[in-house]
């Protein structure tokens, strides 16, 4: 039977790295559902960057994962086509550099919905078709363990994701579904493209390895966590020794 994997936000950044790692290790009849938001051009670029063989495995589905209704449409589409899901990667996430006093309620709500509420209900809706012994992975963040004033709401949601990871272990025990999370630190993604050299230097001084992590390094670890048969309820840091 083919392996069916779902990844949200899989056309850019860490999500893309994880998606490509899965494709790299996939069998010819495996299927990978990849959700993307409003950037159709980016999604198409991701698709066409893959080998012809891997393109056939990809199912690109547009869905605004800050919206419960959009998420439900995504789930309905998956259930129409797939009889089971083996791996689920809740990766999509958004943030803001706004200060606490500048947040609006709508901004706060959108980030909470995207990073926490919708992933909670995505697991709930897909649970009935998750395979026995399946694997769920959340992309958390070291910001969920270390407070940063510039990303308060993001950190709050990621801290909640870490707790959710541990809480779901017992919920999904009857089907022996493993639930884990990764908690990346500062990783070289487009999110940091506007940082000044001074900002990079200041952060690198706090990292024992004196550099930002690479997407491929996070993807490698995510893949190992997904397939490890005895990891369950773990939140795995990957931050280069940030302190």
Task: List the predicted regions and their residue ranges.
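Conserved glycine-rich cofactor-binding loop
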Residues: 11-12
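Conserved glycine-rich Rossmann-like NAD(P)H-binding loop of the short-chain dehydrogenase/reductase
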Residues: 27-44
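Substrate-binding pocket helix/loop in short-chain dehydrogenase/reductase
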Residues: 99-100, 104-112, 192, 199, ...
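Active-site helix of classical SDR
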Residues: 123, 157, 165
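Alpha-helical segment proximal to the catalytic Tyr-Lys
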Residues: 128, 169-174
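C-terminal substrate-recognition "lid" of short-chain dehydrogenase/reductases
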Residues: 129, 211-238
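Residue(s) in the substrate-gating loop at a strand-loop-helix junction
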Residues: 141
């Amino acid at each position: 039977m083919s392996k069916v994997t779902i990844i949200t936000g899989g056309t850019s950044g860490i999500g893309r790295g994880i998606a490509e790692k899965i494709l790299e290790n996939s069998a010819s009849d495996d299927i990978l559902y990849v959700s993307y938001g409003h950037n159709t051009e980016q999604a198409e670029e991701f698709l066409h960057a893959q080998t012809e063989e891997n393109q056939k495995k990809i199912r690109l589905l547009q869905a605004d994962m800050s919206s419960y209704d959009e998420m439900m449409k995504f789930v309905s589409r998956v259930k129409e086509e797939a009889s089971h899901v083996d791996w689920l990667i809740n990766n999509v996430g958004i943030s803001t550099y706004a200060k606490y006093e500048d947040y609006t309620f709508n901004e706060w709500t959108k980030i909470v919905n995207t990073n926490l509420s919708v992933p909670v209900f995505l697991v709930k809706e897909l649970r009935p078709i998750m395979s026995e012994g399946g694997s769920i992975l959340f992309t958390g963040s070291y910001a969920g363990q270390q407070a940063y004033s510039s990303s308060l709401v993001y950190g709050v949601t990621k801290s909640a994701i870490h707790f959710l990871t541990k809480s779901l272990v017992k919920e999904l025990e009857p089907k022996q579904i493993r639930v884990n999370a990764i908690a990346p630190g500062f990783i070289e993604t487009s999110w940091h493209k506007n940082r000044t050299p001074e900002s990079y230097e200041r952060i690198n001084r706090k990292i024992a390895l004196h550099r930002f992590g690479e997407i491929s390094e996070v993807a490698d670890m995510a893949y190992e966590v997904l397939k490890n048969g005895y990891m369950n309820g773990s939140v795995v840091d990957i931050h280069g020794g940030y302190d």
